Regions:
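Cytosolic catalytic headpiece
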Residues: 1-13, 18-218
Length: 218
């Protein structure tokens, strides 16, 4: 019988369809201009997240016709850079991505990462959301909040496994605050945050060394 079950968060514990729910601006940044920049960087983004950013922007009253992407160069998301965006013909560079990735871009350029924005990021994360940080010309302009939905009935399933003596472990690329919130909501016993494939292997090895039989799902 298995002792430990590792589960991928996305699609197994959550529905896996993260949606943009809020635009949060950095101090002194105009909301309308911020939303336009978010949309410009998402227009050719085919991911569910990208499409939901465009959708939320439309609902915020942004006229799509006023967005000009002629001659723009789209920057695709990669696992290495952890961000995506657009380079506009006038030299404007817009990037959106993970907190650590954008912080690196901003601080490498000698700019400060606003404390107020860090607070917003912490609040989104501890509420189970995913913060996508946006910067324009290497200066932070705000955060897009994404939310994922935990599958109904998942807590009961984990409760049953617990009674059978199975330890459940959620594996996610989310930051530790978001991971902790979702792990608690879903009712798993443990979690691996900001997980890379080698972290998963490391955890499995550790469990096996203590004589546990480990299975993986998702």
């Amino acid at each position: 019988d298995i002792d430990t079950l590792l589960l991928d968060k996305t699609g197994t514990i959550t529905i896996g369809n993260r949606k943009a729910t809020h635009f949060h601006t950095a101090p002194g940044i105009d909301l309308h201009a911020f939303v336009e920049n978010c949309l410009l960087s998402s227009l050719s983004d085919e991911t569910p997240e990208g499409k939901s950013i465009v959708e939320l922007g439309r609902e915020s009253g942004i006229r799509m016709r006023s967005l000009n992407t002629t001659g723009a160069r789209m920057i695709k998301f990669t696992a290495e850079t952890k961000c995506s965006g657009v380079d506009l013909p006038d030299g404007t560079q817009i990037r959106k991505g993970a907190f650590d990735a954008i912080r690196k871009i901003v601080e490498t350029a000698g700019n400060k990462f606003p404390e107020e924005v860090e607070k917003v990021i912490a609040a989104i994360s501890s509420n189970g959301g995913t913060p996508l940080v946006v910067c324009v010309n290497r200066k932070v302009t705000g955060v897009i909040e994404l939310q994922d939905i935990i599958k109904p009935g998942i807590q009961e399933r984990f409760e049953r496994l617990r009674k059978m003596g199975v330890k459940t472990v959620m594996v996610t690329g989310d930051n530790p605050l978001t991971a902790k919130y979702i792990a608690e909501k879903a009712g798993v016993d443990d979690f691996i945050a900001e997980a890379k494939p080698e972290d998963k292997m490391e955890y499995i090895k550790k469990e096996q060394q203590s004589g546990k039989l480990v299975a993986m799902m998702g």
